[in-house]
Amino acid sequence: ECLCRCSGLYFCLSVPEMMKSFYYPHRNAKNPINNADIIYTPDATVFKTDTSRPKLMDEKDWYDVDVITCAAPNLRKRPSNQFNQDNGDRSVKVSDKELLEIHKKRLTRILDVAALNGAEVVILGAFGCGAFQNKPEVVARAAKEAMADYLHAFKTIEFAVYCPPRDDT
């Protein structure tokens, strides 16, 4: 969400062809697990600060990033809400083993796309550990296992995971 607030990414993702090929199929499936489809968005311009109230940066400070979009499983008890209206009406039951495989597949696809597009630095997010209630230990294990084949593919792999000030875990 942060990238959508601070850059032109939202506008790239909300064009009719993206809605038709990516978002509408997800919504029509009404499956909170979603799927491993990916959108690669090169050169999304970041023009606002990454703060609680983003501010327009001086144009000389703008920069471009390539973004890989892939949906995480939505494991909420009530997956549909005002932000995810088409994730189905019922929660899904998925074992930790099944969830691990889902995450490994998606993370591997993300890393494949990054490598194929010549990325030197990859920054991964929490991938469902926040609002979608995926278990952090399962996602972390999937990331560790998926990254094993990419240790020399990138100069840096980082995790940008938001932690509120009151949470020091």
Model segments located where?
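Macrodomain-like recognition of ADP-ribose-binding/processing modules
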Residues: E1-T169
